[in-house]
Amino acid sequence: MTTLLNPYFGEFGGMYVPQILMPALRQLEEAFVSAQKDPAFQAEFTDLLKNYAGRPTALTKCRNLTEGTKTTLYLKREDLLHGGAHKTNQVLGQALLAKRMGKTEIIAETGAGQHGVASALACALLGLKCRIYMGAKDIERQSPNVFRMRLMGADVIPVHSGSATLKDACNEALRDWSGSYDTAHYMLGTAAGPHPFPTIVREFQRMIGEETKAQILEKEGRLPDAVIACVGGGSNAIGMFADFIDDTSVGLIGVEPAGHGIESGEHGAPLKHGRVGIYFGMKSPMMQTDEGQIEESYSISAGLDFPSVGPQHAHLNSIGRAEYVSITDDEALEAFKTLCRNEGIIPALESSHALAYALKMIKEDPEKEQLLVVNLSGRGDKDIFTVHDILKARGEI
């Protein structure tokens, strides 16, 4: 099929879907390309981001975390966005696209529940029906977000197959869409999946990096030495990285979840520890068994518990433009507690992975003068019960 936009990032990406979905993807690509050139669409999207979601979000300088060091650390506060995370940015864009295509229903998948909440709020606002697939295990560990979705009128459908987590929810959502795309739009939650989703999601998250660049230049008069973001599927990270890719002086650092440790096999770090394969409609690194079956991923944070990664991250890694590292559950939990106690900000466990790596960089060389920005992709209200149970089991509370 001829596409309007390049479906690949280097060797990664593509449209590996059943033939039945090709017309839906083509229609979506056409709607996106025309919307990008339509001033009325852009004006409505910008208005929603500003007056409904609360953009621009703050760039907060840490007062206490860097004390006694020569690092200056800023947090890009996506946690302050309506809905509690960066997810709200791109769902507003996709919901407007759905309406532009004449769709009346939204199908979505969610892991941590943040994309589900964002999808539910966008549908409530714009008058769309909403059904959300969520792994049964994730429903258990993210009950506040499940209730939020239902409060806003969404139908939350538990998925019991496989590991009952995000990858299984993705499979069910795609299955649903293949039979309902005449009336429904699949609102994919991350910068992964078949073309054109990775490009659409990046463009609808790009303002994170654009705002960060303008804000840091205003506050510090120069670009940061590095921007750091957690990577599951990779939407918050690509939103932060996109506007800095051509600024080669700026390091791009993506942080995957090492879970219980890479050597344990219980992690979610396919970029550095997976093999290239085809899954979820794309060619990208993924966690596989020796037989080529998709392996279960694991992370303390439901939003990073995904066995593959967006194709643009795979490309940035392959050409050496971005560096990808990993952080364990314990390191993320420590960073979570550190930010709470030292700055009065409760971060999402996902974002805590990025913060943990920044703190590691600072600790390794306290005398190094460096300007760092961490994308605080979401707030941690959804995680307080998980953290409470862990700390209680350890006798820390």
From Swiss-Prot:
The modification N6-(pyridoxal phosphate)lysine is found at K87. It is an enzyme of class 4 (lyase). The keyword ATP-binding does not apply. It catalyses: (1S,2R)-1-C-(indol-3-yl)glycerol 3-phosphate + L-serine = D-glyceraldehyde 3-phosphate + L-tryptophan + H2O. InterPro entries: Trp_synth_b_CS (IPR006653), Trp_synth_beta (IPR006654), Trp_synth_beta/beta-like (IPR023026), TrpB-like_PALP (IPR001926), TrpB-like_PALP_sf (IPR036052). Pathway: Amino-acid biosynthesis; L-tryptophan biosynthesis; L-tryptophan from chorismate: step 5/5. It comes from the Bacteria. Disulfide bonds: none annotated. PANTHER family: TRYPTOPHAN SYNTHASE, TRYPTOPHAN SYNTHASE-RELATED. The beta subunit is responsible for the synthesis of L-tryptophan from indole and L-serine. This is Tryptophan synthase beta chain. The gene is trpB.
